[in-house]
Curated annotation (Swiss-Prot):
The keyword Glycoprotein does not apply. One of its GO terms (cellular component) is cytoplasm. Homodimer. It is an enzyme of class 2 (transferase). It comes from the Eukaryota. Its cofactor is pyridoxal 5'-phosphate. The lineage of its organism: Eukaryota, Viridiplantae, Streptophyta, Embryophyta, Tracheophyta. Keywords: Amino-acid biosynthesis, Cysteine biosynthesis, Cytoplasm, Pyridoxal phosphate, Transferase. Its EC number is 2.5.1.47. This is Cysteine synthase. It is found in: Cytoplasm. Belongs to the cysteine synthase/cystathionine beta-synthase family.
Amino acid sequence: TPNSYILQQFENPANPKLIVAIFPSFGER
């Protein structure tokens, strides 16, 4: 599911840009 995929990206430091792309406010911290 998309949700589990997003959770996997949270646990994977190799994809910080994907996290920022999904959560722009997350990248501002």
